[in-house]
Amino acid sequence: MGCFESKPSEQHQPTAVRGCTDIFWLVVYILFWIALLVIAVFSFVYGNPLRVINGYDSFGNTCGVSSNEKFSHFPLSGMNTKDKPYVFFLDIKELRQTLKICVKECPKKEIGNAMELYRYYEERDTKYCRYDFNMSLLTAPDASGPKYFAFAGPCPKFPVYESSSVLHRCIPSGKNAPTKVVKDMYALVNSFGAAQQVFSDIYKTWPTVLLLVGLSLIFSIILIMMLHWLTAIISWLICIFVAVASIGITAVLWWSYYKQKHSIDTDTKLSYLEELVRNETTIYVLAILATCIMIILLVVIYYLREKLSGLAALFEEAGKCMLQIPGLAGPPVLAFIALAVFLSFWMVVIVCLATANYPNVKPLLPFTQLKENPNKTEAAIKPDMSVNNNTYKSFDLVEYPEADFLRHMLWIYIIGLVWTSEFIFACQQLVISGAVAYWYFRKPTDTPVLNAIAKLVKYHLGSVAKGSFIITLFKIPRLILTYLYAKLKRHQQEGSECASCCLKCCICSFWLLEKFIRYLNHNAYTVIAIESVNFCPAAKIAWNALVTNALQVATINGIGDLVLFLGKLAVAALCGLISILMLRDNPDVHFYMAPVIIITLFSFFVAHIVLSLYEMVVDTLFLCVCEDRTINGNSGRWKQSNLAHLLGESPEQDAVEAPMQVVELTPITKQPFSVQSLQMTEIDDKGAV
């Protein structure tokens, strides 16, 4: 039995009018997105990346911004700190309790007394006292007393050491700075959440991220053009390009690791900052992974060299289809725009969630817990009962504790990233499948791509949501297990080898299941586009077709898809290589591997969208050829196709194409199916659900 059987019928009965599929899953997907939007609103209210990147003073002002929120009872809040991007601590020995202010620059030299502080203010127009303090008071004879220079301000305690900016915080860097003080300052910076630091670096590099993701689209389009015009040698070119790119990115990673390690070993103070140490560790791990992947790719390319010549016919046939349907270039562009908009939205929300905090009152002096003397007659001086005694105990400042209730929403957005990305990919796949199937069976004069898009929006969004959710269902557990395995490996103890082995097995199992389901989904979308059935019945039909033609499937999707996958890797590797060269010397970014990883992943997504065009065209043509061969035998259109090679036949270029069949066809589901059903989709949708 072939892909489809023909079944004679006494009278022609076309299939039912196309109706909506998997409506329940469309409702679930819409509700999920409503939840994402609600979380996004809260993240925009509470999140402020600049508050983490630049820091804030003790009055609630974020440093380096033009407008700040004004709080009642805090007259120094709501200030314009655009020209004051750095945080300065008035007493570096009491970092948790001292007053913080925003300053124009960190001290360029050591300041030892009040007059030197005033001269520095006159020379460099940089004020290291509280905003409302009159600096001319420092010239008074009694200015050197403790009333002006304390951890509560209004001016800093001496000496003020020469400092440099680390994450926009002034940290002593002069030779006279005590080691303990420097360590305490770095410990304070390290106390910021790792997620905050990572997403802060991503926020600072967003123009570079957008630039290189856009560049990945250009690289992918160039690769598509090469697939069309250089079919005879494109397989070799892709393999050579992948080999060069993998070697290049591996060499750059090892060189970056050497430079990072050398700089940390040379300057011991740099080792106090966990971001730089984390950067070194990440580069080291990525360099090892890149080396392993490079070796695997070179071995695979070496063994594929004898089979690459057979792919010319495959890509030539796909190129012929795309040449006759120029509209096929539209779905990848639309998918890229949709993915770019979603990823931009996702990045903004995820950064706001990671930096979410809320204003709170903090007492500066820890004397509010002290009780008043109950026997006031024993006091030498009677207290003034008209004054609130709490004013002598403390005065309040503003701090921003983390909004933990929003931090947990990060997991929902991680699920949303996978599900929505897969949803966009699935929409593209179904549109391409429908357009190619209509072109193969009907050869219409109108635009099959627009027709396929219309049918997707009207009827099949539910099936797309279900198919993408199934992929998510297997991918999320694999990501969680991979994370657990990394933590177990980092803190590996004696006796954990068994757990490590089990995790590896589970990760591999979920990876294999995900790849299998993803491949089955590709073909299920083709059946949905043709027959308008729900996702599960369509997957069953596609599975039967694949099993029946297992040898041909292995040939087409084994070698062809592998070469296309190498092309996606090449685009991602090239963009990752460029991002490393652009970001590794950026002084404002400490954990630069975070944006590098984001750029590489997003570039792979973009390349996957564009290059999956060829993949879907080939898969769809294969299913159509299987049906055509079963229905028409050697007189069908497939006999003139280069795909006949892949079906074990010789193409007949001069064969006369048989007319389109008008008899009822019965697919392997044993349910009636007719070519006429394709024509019925043009009928008014009055019978649709």
Swiss-Prot record:
MF terms in GO: transmembrane transporter activity
GO cellular component annotations of the record: membrane
Keyword Glycoprotein: yes
Transmembrane segments annotated in the record for this chain: 23-43, 199-219, 233-255, 283-303, 333-353, 412-432, 461-481, 562-582, 591-611
Main localization category: membrane
Tagged with keyword Membrane: yes
Family named by the database record: Belongs to the CTL (choline transporter-like) family.
Full protein name: Choline transporter-like 1
Gene expressing this chain: Ctl1
